[in-house]
Amino acid sequence: MSSTRHTPDIDAHTISISTAVENVQKGDQLKIEVLDGKTIVAVKNVNPAAAEVITLKNEKLWSPSSPFLYNLKITLLRNGKTVDAITSYFAMRKISMGPDAAGIQRMLLNNKFVFQYGPLDQGWWPDGLYTAPTEEAMVYDIDQLKKMGFNMIRKHIKVEPARYYNYCDINGMLVWQDMPSGDLGNKWETRPGVLDRATEKERSTESEGYYRKEWNAIMNTLYNFPSIVVWVPFNEAWGQFKTVEITEWTMKKDPSRLINSASGGNFFTTGHMIDLHNYPHPAMPRPDVFGSKLLLVLGEFGGLGLPIIGHTWQEKDNWGYQSFKNADDLFDKYATYTKRLEEFIRLGLSAAVYTHTTDVEGEINGFMTYDRKVIKVAVDKLKTVNDRLYLVPAP
């Protein structure tokens, strides 16, 4: 067995499981076992050539507050004997959209509105750039963000190792996954780009081919991680091309997730959401223009900067979108931003992304310093104001 593919359907109370089996022989069977911990809750013997749909009774749903994972064991039987066996896991969770009582589209988790809020996370490290020094260091960031009261991470222009997403699955952290950009050059005609005022990059045949190949590979490789709920094909017009075609292909390839076709501008009428970037203060797309058809999200804002002497990448020329001299002033400003987000949620905002988890080289606008030695604002203070966002009801 070389791979599996798991697709939950909480409305039908089923999990669809397909298994790629090489060198199948006549009479081979797959024994699929679904376990709650070590207790078998469903078992089925099936033909290796077909996907199998298994019904679960009284299934437990996965969410940030209750990240329950079912264990999965698949055994290849030949003449009644085991010739191969693998273990994996899956979650029963659904990400979708639907109108609230006011007709505004809301992002739904397991058919209920859950405001999604988290940092822009580039996953940079001073000693390894895109490579964390250890697994413990990598998951440290996720742990701290959870303690700060965030329920989502936008993984920005980077794909992490599988262990990263596995940890998000286990700990109940939602993930928006970006496609790493290439071919800089095209711009939107107005900032932040709006519908019907967009430009696209004319990429070479080779460049376009690499994009399609790599985006396909990313989606295939990460498909089984339930924490991933949004795919982001393009960001701020960077290398953006054939937006409608790429977005609709992405939606067709994975209808189980939402698609943020163009985060931050260069919008086309495709995908599930319209995504505004605004610095430093929060803003939102107009609900009266877009809200009845698209999810309204704030894909980037904030960037409040605080340099910590002895923990900056460079001594001079550090920057934030707005800089402060002490943590108290920074937090006070941040708290005003979360209060504004509460107002936006009532108007129809479904998600927001703050810039960002850590300082990144010359950018000193992280919650933590680049070396992770200093958390700039007390975790409990951040959690207090962040938690309020999840209590704001939709109409």
PLM region spans:
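Secreted/periplasmic carbohydrate-active enzymes, especially glycoside hydrolases
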Residues: 1-167, 171-175, 214, 229-230, ...
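Substrate-binding/catalytic cleft of secreted carbohydrate-active enzymes
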Residues: 142-144, 152-380, 385
